[in-house]
Amino acid sequence: MRREAADLLLGSMVNSNHVRVVTADLGFGVLDQVRAAFPERFYNVGAAEFTMAGVAVGMANEGVIPVCYSMSSFLLYRPFELLRNYVNHERIPVKLIGSGRDYDYNHDGISHWAHDDEQVLAALPNIKLYKPDTVEDLENIWQE
């Protein structure tokens, strides 16, 4: 469903000048169309997930809608402090899109596993976790 999520993201960017994408050296292929259509609104901070989250928080504070994209494990665990302090506690509106759930990237080792994301996010009650199973689920979630 990565392709469908990228298409929905592109549609959001077409409909709103406020949407920005921040990635941490991931999304190649699936986000190429987004990057090509809106290079001035697409930011790749390199392999630096903490920076990605910090940039997104800063953008949100300036009134834009930041969307962070990364592998689920990298998106949640590496910038955890920023997510806890700003997105959860201060409720700064940052959208997070994670690729891969549970053991989808099993062959890459434990650093890529997101098998305990529900337990970790239970400590952050102001961050909603969605795990769409179908494209219809994804479309419904996207409307929120």
Which functions belong to the PLM regions below?
Residues 1-144:
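Thiamine diphosphate
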